[in-house]
Swiss-Prot record:
Protein name: Copper acquisition factor BIM1
Leader sequence segment: 1-19
Pfam families hit by this protein: BIM1-like_dom
Cofactor(s) demanded: Cu(2+)
Cited CDD domains: LPMO_auxiliary-like
Binding site for Cu(2+): H20, H65, D138
Subcellular location, principal: membrane
Impact reported for H20A: Leads to a hypomelanization phenotype and growth defect on copper-deficient conditions
Gene field: BIM1
The organism of origin for this protein: Cryptococcus neoformans var. grubii serotype A (strain H99 / ATCC 208821 / CBS 10515 / FGSC 9487) (Filobasidiella neoformans var. grubii)
Region (Disordered): 160-194
Residue positions of covalent lipid attachment, annotated as GPI-anchor amidated serine: S190
Induction: Expression is highly induced in response to copper limitation by the copper-specific chelator bathocuproine disulfonic acid (BCS). The BIM1 promoter harbors three conserved Cu-responsive elements (CuRE), which are critical for CUF1 binding and activation under copper-limiting conditions, beginning at positions -239, -268 and -516. Consistent with their presence, binding of the CUF1 copper-sensing transcription factor to the BIM1 promoter is strongly induced under copper-limiting conditions and expression of BIM1 under these conditions is CUF1-dependent.
Family, similarity comment: Belongs to the X325 family.
Length: 218
């Protein structure tokens, strides 16, 4: 009986640890735990685009780590295939980060992004892909969502975000207006990616530093 209980507990812990995070709104392209460390979580094909506010709109995630560092960024490419597509528009304009770099504890969290304020020429009907980069301490993970931006679009009432996690006291000072000079190339052996992978510089180090700071505060 003891052995059986031990197995059950171990299985529960393992399954919980494997489920890193999900992008719940806007709905992600898909989720497979084993490929979440790849570009767009391993889902490299553009899906049906969902309506999303041109101005401020909510993003909902479910974080399965005790503490995780998050940042959001977008691509204006009709078919982004690498992190390079999230750095510049087709005419070479640098795309700022869509959110600050901030931390969240475990659980369902939300934050707001204002894509129109990025000043990269987005208008009513613009098509973009949103990518969330997440680090819970065991490497960067990704989820993507394909969107069409609608001026004045009202999200479902149950998807609004009033307790914005990116505005919490542990959010960093990196703003959505920061340039993509904060991105740098890093090679990856993950399948399904094309070209050099672009990741936020020092993202893992920042996550560690913020975690240490949190421990000191505690």
């Amino acid at each position: 009986m003891f052995a059986l209980k031990s197995i059950l507990v171990t299985s529960l812990i393992t399954s919980t640890a494997l489920a890193h995070f999900t992008l719940d709104y806007p709905q992600s392209r898909g989720f497979v735990d084993d490929t979440e460390n790849q570009f767009c979580g391993g889902f490299n094909t553009v899906e049906a685009r969902q309506p999303f506010p041109l101005g401020s709109g909510p993003v909902h995630i479910d974080s399965h780590h005790a503490l995780a560092t998050i940042v959001a960024f977008i691509s204006t490419s009709s078919n982004p295939t690498s992190f390079d597509d999230f750095n510049t528009t087709s005419n070479g304009t640098a795309i700022p980060l869509a959110s600050s770099i901030f931390q969240v504890p475990q659980g369902e969290k939300c934050f707001n992004i204002d894509l129109q304020s990025l000043n990269v020429g987005l208008t009513n009907g613009s098509e973009v892909t949103l990518q969330i980069q997440y680090d819970g301490g065991d490497g960067n993970l990704y989820q993507c969502s394909d969107l069409v931006l609608i001026e004045g679009y009202e999200v479902p009432s149950n998807e609004t975000c009033t307790n914005d996690a990116s505005k919490a006291s542990n959010a960093t000072s990196t703003s959505s207006g920061s340039a993509t000079a904060t991105s740098a190339a890093a090679t990856s052996s993950s399948s399904g990616t094309s070209g050099a992978i672009k990741e936020v510089v020092g993202f893992g180090a920042l996550s560690l530093a913020l975690g240490i700071a949190g421990l000191i505060i505690l």
